[in-house]
Design a protein with these regions (language model features):
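Conserved PLP-binding catalytic core of the aspartate aminotransferase-like
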Residues: 280-312
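Conserved core of the PLP fold type I
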Residues: 35-165, 175-194, 263, 342, ...
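Conserved core segment of the aminotransferase class I/II
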Residues: 21, 196-261
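N-terminal "arm"/small-domain region of PLP-dependent enzymes with the aminotransferase-like
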Residues: 1-47, 311-314, 334
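PLP-dependent enzyme catalytic core of the Aspartate aminotransferase-like
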Residues: 311, 325-371
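Hydrophobic residues in well-ordered beta-strands that form the structural core
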Residues: 89, 110, 168-170, 243, ...
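Conserved glycine-rich beta-strand-loop-beta hairpin in the small C-terminal domain of fold type I
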Residues: 244, 261-271, 282-295
Length: 371
């Protein structure tokens, strides 16, 4: 039986632009080898900073380029947080962001996510109880739910950020991967003075380029760059130089179109399979990104789910990892981008069988048995 991996949100290797990267590497080295292969400023490779600034309608002084958006988030935490500070996050949210925040000793306050993203009523209630230093959000096709924050919720975030004087950390790697519908304004476009926008070339080019970036107020960029310099002196100008040449050569827009053409139908296949094999369990209905998600119910034990899934030839991520505290239901993230249509459908069929089996066992009071 073929194993189907539903655990990681990775891109399809067939989308990696190997030939154009090879050509741009040669071109970039021929043009700027001395700078690409030398130490440089912690802010990142200047031509790539210039490209990102133009892309985001900003200034080069508002851009910091590093080894990845998660590392840059860690640097933001180093720069702005002290043990005991309060940080609001969506619940569920990106598991590695939770890990990073815990390593900094902060108090994490989770706010429930629904079909329209973060629940603004719950957010407002928590504001009356806690004063956050930062609010970490993934507004577009959130990891892990796939939810997209409504315009009203975005406006509320900006209004409260001004009123309560906290910074918004907008993690936006999926915003360019909308497969249907109209793009929504980013938090940064609504409040550039309050928003620290993180993104990455990981999902757009490949994880191997290890290049992410921060677009933020100039004073924030300088502060985070100072932290970055303490950690690695200088980022990889070699990788950043290749990406800069690749972007300047007009490769980014066609690559985005290619990703949408491949991943959009896979999302449709995933949603159809969930509706067929796991009816009523879809958490939200995403219009882009890398993930769908499921609400499996409280009676399904995590350990039993993982064991039964392994027997069925499935690899699943832990739903608990995406929560700051144990939820009252079983959650499962479903990545679809790296799987073809047949594996997506078969994976949902097997998962549906696993869930039905576990629910039947729970109702009868039996422990997990072999499927």
């Amino acid at each position: 039986m073929k194993t189907i991996d539903l655990s990681r949100g990775v891109p399809d290797p067939r989308t990696f632009p190997v030939d154009s990267l090879r050509a741009m590497a040669a071109s970039a080295l021929a043009r700027d080898a001395d700078r690409m292969l030398q130490y440089g400023p912690a802010f990142g490779y200047p031509p790539l900073r210039e490209f990102i600034a133009s892309w985001f309608d900003s200034a080069m002084s508002n851009v910091l380029v590093g080894h990845g958006s998660l590392e840059l988030f860690n640097f933001i935490c180093d720069a702005y947080l002290q043990p005991g500070d309060v940080v609001f996050v969506e619940r569920p949210t990106y598991d590695r962001a939770i890990t990073t925040l815990r390593q900094h000793g902060v108090k994490i306050v989770g706010i429930d996510v629904g079909a329209d993203g973060i629940c603004i009523d719950a957010f407002e209630r928590e504001l009356k109880r806690h004063q956050p230093k930062l609010v970490y959000l993934i507004p577009d096709f959130q990891n892990p739910t796939g939810a997209c924050m409504s315009v009203d919720a975005r406006r509320a975030m900006v209004r409260w950020a001004r009123e309560y004087r906290f910074l918004l950390v907008e993690d936006g790697p999926y915003g360019f991967l909308r497969y249907r519908g109209t793009p929504l304004p980013s938090l940064r476009s609504m409040a550039p003075d309050l928003t620290l926008h993180l993104s990455s070339f990981t999902k757009l080019i490949s994880p191997g380029v290890r290049t992410g970036f921060l677009v933020a107020p100039e004073d924030v960029v300088k502060r985070v760059a100072s932290v970055a310099e303490r950690h690695y002196i200088t980022p990889s100008f070699f990788a950043q130089g290749i990406i800069a040449a690749w972007c300047e050569d007009g490769r980014l827009a066609p690559q985005l179109d290619r990703l949408k053409q491949l991943y959009g139908p896979r999302l449709d296949t995933c949603l159809q399979a969930i509706e067929h094999y796991l009816p009523g369990r879809l958490f939200v209905r995403p219009d882009g990104g890398f993930f769908a998600s499921l609400r499996l119910g409280a009676r399904i034990d995590e350990q039993s789910l993982q064991a039964a899934a392994r027997e069925a030839g499935l690899v699943l991520s832990s739903g608990r990892a995406f929560f700051d505290a144990q939820p009252g239901y079983r959650f499962l993230r479903v990545p679809f981008c790296a799987l073809d249509a047949a594996d997506i459908t078969e994976g949902m069929r097997r998962l549906g069988d696993v869930v039905d089996h576990l629910n039947t066992a729970a109702r009868s009071g039996k422990a997990h048995a072999t499927i």
